[in-house]
Amino acid sequence: MADPGHVFRRAFSWLPSQFASQSDAPVGAPRQFGSTEHLSVEAIAAFVDGELRMSAHLRAAHHLSLCPECAAEVDAQSQARTALRESCPIAIPNSLLGMLSQIPHRTPEVTPDVSEQAKFADDPTRGRRKRR
């Protein structure tokens, strides 16, 4: 069976480049990370926090060795992480705790008005449309 990907890409060639497919992979194929792509904000945070799988970590580390822009983003994320860890503990004001404790746990039960209920097909009070 022929690959329909070229037809799809050609049909949407009028779209701006950020919407167009940048790879020659068939349409619907899993997206692969390209070494020339920049790391996403989520990937940078996961890299700094040590949450990436080993294969993803190695790909990101290789990209960081080649891309000073992403390396600067990782450095900034690391500094932000360190600043948050070294900051003073956050104290919750007692007035806020008091207001939060007054929030009801359940919503009050309100029965809907009969006139506001949806009209269903089997409802005998529902008006019938007449043929013209």
From Swiss-Prot:
Q: In which compartments does the protein localize?
A: Cytoplasm
Location of the region described as Disordered in the Swiss-Prot/TrEMBL record: 106-132
**Listed GO CC annotations:** cytoplasm
What modifications does the entry list under PTM / processing? Phosphorylated by PknB on Thr-36; can be dephosphorylated (at least in vitro) by PstP. Phosphorylation is the signal for subsequent degradation by the ClpC1-ClpP2 complex.
**Annotated Zn(2+) binding sites:** 63, 67, 70
Name the keywords, alphabetized.
Cytoplasm, Metal-binding, Phosphoprotein, Transcription, Transcription regulation, Zinc
Which prosthetic group or cofactor does it need? Zn(2+)
Among its keywords, does the record have Ion transport? no
Cofactor: bound how, per the entry note?
Binds 1 Zn(2+) ion per subunit.
Q: Induction: what does the entry report? A: Total levels of RseA decrease after detergent or vancomycin treatment of whole cells (at protein level).
Describe the inactivation phenotype: No phenotype upon growth in liquid culture.
Q: Where Phosphothreonine occurs, residue numbers?
A: 36
- List the Gene Ontology MF annotations in alphabetical order: metal ion binding
Gene3D superfamilies, alphabetically?
Answer: Anti-sigma factor, zinc-finger domain (1.10.10.1320)
Q: What is the protein's quaternary organization?
A: Interacts with ECF RNA polymerase sigma factor SigE, interaction is abrogated by treatment of cells with H(2)O(2), detergent or vancomycin (the latter 2 cause surface stress). This probably inhibits the interaction of SigE with the RNA polymerase catalytic core.
Query: What does this gene product do?
Result: An anti-sigma factor for extracytoplasmic function (ECF) sigma factor SigE. ECF sigma factors are held in an inactive form by an anti-sigma factor.
Q: Which family does it belong to?
A: Belongs to the zinc-associated anti-sigma factor (ZAS) superfamily.
Q: What is this protein called?
A: Anti-sigma-E factor RseA
Which species does this protein come from?
A: Mycolicibacterium smegmatis (strain ATCC 700084 / mc(2)155) (Mycobacterium smegmatis)
Q: Which gene encodes it?
A: rseA
